[in-house]
Amino acid sequence: MIKIKKRKRNTYEVYALGQHICMSPHKARRIIDQIRGRSYEETLMILELMPYRACYPIFKLIYSAAANASHNMGFNEANLIISKAEVNEGTTVKKLKPQARGRGYPIKRSTCHISIVLKNISLYEEYDEYIYI
């Protein structure tokens, strides 16, 4: 189950946080490192073409953050870049797999928390015009 939390801190940044995603944090970091600092549209193309299972939850989070930006803040999706993307280790789900002769073998299923921050670069361009005049 993916639980998505949405936060807003600055007037030019939009957050989306996915918690308890059932995948290894190392595998999710491998994908996040590829998309950090890229534009929103370029990121969606990269994630659609990558052949990894970790791409789909990250794709959903980025899409959700962009929907937050356009609906809540009124930003254009073409002006968004991924300013911060991080993967943290979540809780470990522990289960028992039945074995022969009444024994049980523990299975550890790792989860991770992914946070995505999108930044609107058009606001920076407007501020730069006022600073250098």
Swiss-Prot record:
Location in or out of the cell: Plastid, Chloroplast
Keyword Metal-binding: no
TM ranges: none
Family annotation (InterPro entries): Ribosomal_uL22, Ribosomal_uL22_bac/chlpt-type, Ribosomal_uL22_bac/org-type, Ribosomal_uL22_sf
Single Gene Ontology BP annotation: translation
Gene Ontology MF terms in the entry: rRNA binding; structural constituent of ribosome
Gene3D superfamilies: Ribosomal protein L22/L17
Keyword entries, A-Z: Chloroplast, Plastid, Ribonucleoprotein, Ribosomal protein, RNA-binding, rRNA-binding
One of the record's GO cellular component terms: large ribosomal subunit
Stated role: This protein binds specifically to 23S rRNA.
Subunit structure as annotated in this protein's UniProt entry: Part of the 50S ribosomal subunit.
Family: Belongs to the universal ribosomal protein uL22 family.
NCBIfam families to which the protein is assigned, alphabetical: rplV_bact
UniProt cross-references to PANTHER family, sorted A to Z: CHLOROPLAST 50S RIBOSOMAL PROTEIN L22-RELATED, LARGE RIBOSOMAL SUBUNIT PROTEIN UL22M
Protein name: Large ribosomal subunit protein uL22c
Organism: Manihot esculenta
Classification of source organism: Eukaryota, Viridiplantae, Streptophyta, Embryophyta, Tracheophyta
Name of the gene: rpl22
